[in-house]
Swiss-Prot record:
<dbReference type="GO" id="GO:0080044">
    <property type="term" value="F:quercetin 7-O-glucosyltransferase activity"/>
</dbReference>
<dbReference type="GO" id="GO:0047214">
    <property type="term" value="F:cyanidin-3-rhamnosylglucoside 5-O-glucosyltransferase activity"/>
</dbReference>
<dbReference type="InterPro" id="IPR002213">
    <property type="entry name" value="UDP_glucos_trans"/>
</dbReference>
<dbReference type="GO" id="GO:0080043">
    <property type="term" value="F:quercetin 3-O-glucosyltransferase activity"/>
</dbReference>
<feature type="binding site">
    <location>
        <position position="365"/>
    </location>
    <ligand>
        <name>UDP-alpha-D-glucose</name>
    </ligand>
</feature>
<feature type="binding site">
    <location>
        <position position="364"/>
    </location>
    <ligand>
        <name>UDP-alpha-D-glucose</name>
    </ligand>
</feature>
<feature type="binding site">
    <location>
        <position position="345"/>
    </location>
    <ligand>
        <name>UDP-alpha-D-glucose</name>
    </ligand>
</feature>
<feature type="binding site">
    <location>
        <position position="363"/>
    </location>
    <ligand>
        <name>UDP-alpha-D-glucose</name>
    </ligand>
</feature>
<protein>
    <recommendedName>
        <fullName>Cyanidin 3-O-rutinoside 5-O-glucosyltransferase</fullName>
        <ecNumber>2.4.1.116</ecNumber>
    </recommendedName>
</protein>
<feature type="binding site">
    <location>
        <position position="385"/>
    </location>
    <ligand>
        <name>UDP-alpha-D-glucose</name>
    </ligand>
</feature>
<dbReference type="GO" id="GO:0009718">
    <property type="term" value="P:anthocyanin-containing compound biosynthetic process"/>
</dbReference>
<feature type="active site" description="Proton acceptor">
    <location>
        <position position="16"/>
    </location>
</feature>
<keyword id="KW-0808">Transferase</keyword>
<comment type="similarity">
    <text>Belongs to the UDP-glycosyltransferase family.</text>
</comment>
<feature type="binding site">
    <location>
        <position position="368"/>
    </location>
    <ligand>
        <name>UDP-alpha-D-glucose</name>
    </ligand>
</feature>
<feature type="binding site">
    <location>
        <position position="360"/>
    </location>
    <ligand>
        <name>UDP-alpha-D-glucose</name>
    </ligand>
</feature>
<feature type="binding site">
    <location>
        <position position="16"/>
    </location>
    <ligand>
        <name>an anthocyanidin</name>
    </ligand>
</feature>
Amino acid sequence: MAKQHFLVITIGAQGHINPARRLAARLIEAGGARVTLTVPILAYRRMFPSAAAELEPREEKDDGLLTYMPYSDGVEDGLDPAANPAEFKRRIAESLRCIAAGFVARGRPITCIVYALLLSMAAAVARDLGVPSVLFWIQSATSFAVNYHYFAGGYDKLFSEAAADPSFLVELPGLPAFRRKDLPTLLTGPRPEGTFYSFLHTLYGEVFETLRREVSAGEEKPRVILNTFRALEEDVVAGFEASIDMVTVGPLVPPSLIMTSPEETATNDLYEHDTSNYMEWLDGKEEGSVVYVSFGSYATLKEEEREEVKKGLSASGRPYIWAMAKGGSGDDGGGLGVKVEWCEQARVLSHRSVGCFVTHCGWNSVAEAMACGVPMVMLPQWTDQVTNAKLAEEEWGVGVRAEAVAGEELRRCLDVVMGGGEADDGGIVMRRRAKAWSEKAREAAGDGGSSARNLAAFVVGGN
């Protein structure tokens, strides 16, 4: 049997590239498949600064495990995707066809296209090529279910009612009840024509329209790879299995978090890692005493919100490390905390001194926190972050959601999570739950775990 060759395509955001790269690496490890990860040209140039300004049509880079290739989405030529979504999609589809043709010419034909969130045009390319395609859902299974019911399940009117009434409960099959504050913001917020929000809403809709057509065709169940693990969202996953092959492969976190002797691969991130001695700083702190603060690579705080976060951290009296993508490095808060521009989050979260994670609640961050057993204080901002916050607080019991970006509220939440250690301290229960979920996450992703088995089976049946 010929070796599988998966083409994994993702958009050029760090929060999308990270899980795509980890999935690609796991596919190789699970069954010896050949995997090519393709990213937009601008992201490729940032990941590989030595890449020529004028890329060759079949440019490839190898990091020792994966092969990387750039694709064109037009942004490198100044295209505004929100202003011209049709051209954005056309450029991507054309580029993917060229990539596939190049591999045929080199005797390494693509046998399956795995497309990440927002890139359903890849499914159309796969149909034209006569190869299967698989959606890679980089968010939670619950987020998948909410979006599916909105775009393809006929429940969109409930979301409109929630948008008009914050107290209205949206009840969807197999899911907890949601209020507006818990629902992905793209489904309830304003989306003026021609804006980025409208553009994203359209791309999400096309993903689920593609799935709806595949389900309706009834020839073979469409497959969706999910960055979650079975034990975490058992009922949600089971609720779709009659019509969709739900392949749980998570948590897709750095190998160091789930394996005793991992083989690390090159990071090739879009951002340069801070070279300050923050790990040495962590070494000097007591176990579980440090607050780690990061709002991801996309989420941003207004200046007044940053000041409120700083007030809350200072008022808590606990040492903290704050990763700020554009905030500078150095001492912050009179010696109580340090700021870094960009750090290796997995190393920080897994450090013995870190006892709490103040986070925007992006799914990658939630997955890494759960893998490390670190409870969270959550300040979600948009998209699925608000849904993740609800799940972490109410379903899994591993975090507290701040009601506002305010210093006193942040201090209160930190006290709840890190608490004083009394027998009735709710933080004790939360920390125990976080550790218990950490063990389940590692079990799922480790050798012989449910996610590892699913990956191996997927590689065998990839075409």
